[in-house]
Amino acid sequence: RVPINKRPCQCALPNDSRCANCTNVAGLPKSTVDYLRQLQDYCSDQETLDCKFVLSGGTETHLHSENTRHRPGNPVVDVVPNTQTQAVYKSLINAAGGVTTVARCENEKGEHIPACSVPQTNHIHFEFRW
């Protein structure tokens, strides 16, 4: 089971505080869940690097930018490692390299952080292959 950082969203209104602070997974493709489990397995096998993570972004369209790919049916998620270091971010990105079309560090606004610098990096944005 892939851990999720927050409760499911109760509504989808962009500027309504009742619809904030949530993470949806309904509508994620099965392949995306399978890829996340593969990443979990990779992290479990690491002896020197604790790269376990939680899912922090899924299909909650209303919490992302207007042109977001975070939508039901899309293989797009955000993850936050339990240990937030540059080495862990890069390790997860490298581990997912064969099954993603996009794997990058982003800040809390969804802006790309090229070097995965800490503390600027807030999460990893993954767009998995179909």
Region annotations inferred by a language model:
Residues R1-V54:
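Active-site acidic/histidine clusters and adjacent loop/turn architecture
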Residues A26, H64-W130:
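Catalytic cores and adjacent binding grooves of peptidoglycan-active enzymes
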Residues Y42-S56, T100-H112:
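Short glycine-rich, low-complexity/disordered patches
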Residues F53-T68:
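Active-site nucleotide-donor binding segment shared across nucleotidyl transfer reactions
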